[in-house]
Amino acid sequence: MEQHIYLIGMNHRTASIDVRECFALTEHCSKDDWAIPLIKGIQESLILSTCNRVEILAVGDSNTPEIILSAWAKVKTRSIEELVPHTYTYQGRSAISHLFCVASSLDSMVLGEPQILGQLKDAYKLATIAGASKTILNRLLHKAFSVAKRVRTETSIASNAVSISYAAVKLAKKIFGTMNQYKAMLIGAGEMAELAAMHLMQAGIQQLKIVNRTYSQAQELASQFRGEAIPFEKLVTYLAEVDIVISSTGAPQTIIHFNDIKNILSKRKHYPMLFIDIAVPRDIDPNVHQLDNIYLYDIDDLKEIVEDNIVQRQDEAIKAKHIIQDEIDSFCAWLQALILQPTIVDLRKRFSTYAEEELERTLKKIGPVDRKTREALETMIDALIRKLTHDPISYLKCAHRTIDTNHITLARQMFNLDKIPQTNKAVNED
């Protein structure tokens, strides 16, 4: 069976946050989401779901994209017609290139941001635990990690790199100006919250409150930044005391509702509040922006803020893409050998079988020959086999640089290779 590498996904360029949150595949969602790797017909897979993208990397036959899209829509209880217009599909070399760009943060909203590599490593860990990442994806993901490291080492793409959290705090400064007279709350205690806390403290925020479902994690983060840890169940109570709220949880649904905010406005005497929701799915009810003196921004609203960052890093991105092309060639050479080897072995075996049969038939006709003559005949036959198989093998190696197995199928049919008894056959996957 022919196998190919596919990457099917959506990101901040192809889908708005309204769409991305509908199709997010987070750990907090139904376990069925993570059953996608185990669907019949897909040999290997990995799911990467972040605030800006959902991507499924897979090894399978030509039906793989359709299988994945159908399963994806099904686990999110949506129609495939709602999903497909916002997705992209890459195959073979294009899929590998896209993955390497993602790992190196060349495809991120914030060019050069460091979070995506950690998120990809987490996704790989989940795939290995599920038994979904095997020979090809194991090699491909480790190559992606080394590519990202090389890009960061050999270019300045990550120098003074900003993050989504940085952009969120920059937006707060743009709206409020001097920060030293305001109080802030962070909802979530992960890496994005930690970065936001750091930038808020650097901006001079007067007071910082940390809320998280796991209270001990809120305490740990609060201790790093002289903040106050708040139990999750008291979130709404303490909202009235802060001016800026940055939320970045992995919750599967809204945690701050319209009425929550409406009810605290009178306590604040309608003093303005800024909410920055960088979670996908969103943590804060989008309708909150309808309330007077409430300013709500989501992750898509941060695009303008990071445009300067993209312009400043374009030259380094060009250098990074050259590195990526080199590494694609390296991986494809390994993949080519993995996929081609069984066919090359079978081709030589087929010619050797024919040659041995003809040699024995000829020797029976001419009668016994001495050892020296037999060795000479065998040497001649070996040389003839090498010459006869040289051009077909060279063609296969040259054609396979596109990571397309159609020519392998043709060669196997042409030389009737699938009827050769197989022993210890190498993995034939793309």
From Swiss-Prot:
Alphabetic keyword roster: NADP, Oxidoreductase, Porphyrin biosynthesis
Hydrolase is among the record's keywords: no
PROSITE patterns the record matches: GLUTR
UniProt-recorded Gene Ontology molecular function terms: glutamyl-tRNA reductase activity; NADP binding
Signal sequence, start to end: none
Top-tier EC class: oxidoreductase
Record: active site: 51
Reactions accelerated catalytically: (S)-4-amino-5-oxopentanoate + tRNA(Glu) + NADP(+) = L-glutamyl-tRNA(Glu) + NADPH + H(+)
Annotated metabolic or biological route of this protein: Porphyrin-containing compound metabolism; protoporphyrin-IX biosynthesis; 5-aminolevulinate from L-glutamyl-tRNA(Glu): step 1/2
E.C. numbers: 1.2.1.70
Record site: Important for activity: 98
Binding site residues for substrate: 50-53, 108, 113-115, 119
GO biological process: protoporphyrinogen IX biosynthetic process from glutamate
InterPro entries per UniProt: 4pyrrol_synth_GluRdtase, 4pyrrol_synth_GluRdtase_dimer, 4pyrrol_synth_GluRdtase_N, GluRdtase_CS, GluRdtase_dimer_dom_sf, GluRdtase_N_sf, NAD(P)-bd_dom_sf, Shikm_DH/Glu-tRNA_Rdtase
Coiled coil: none
Residues the entry annotates as binding NADP(+): 188-193
Domain notes: Possesses an unusual extended V-shaped dimeric structure with each monomer consisting of three distinct domains arranged along a curved 'spinal' alpha-helix. The N-terminal catalytic domain specifically recognizes the glutamate moiety of the substrate. The second domain is the NADPH-binding domain, and the third C-terminal domain is responsible for dimerization.
Subunit note: Homodimer.
Function: Catalyzes the NADPH-dependent reduction of glutamyl-tRNA(Glu) to glutamate 1-semialdehyde (GSA).
Family to which the UniProt record says this protein belongs: Belongs to the glutamyl-tRNA reductase family.
NCBIfam families linked to this entry: hemA
Full protein name: Glutamyl-tRNA reductase
Lineage of source species: Bacteria, Pseudomonadati, Thermodesulfobacteriota, Desulfovibrionia, Desulfovibrionales
Primary gene name: hemA
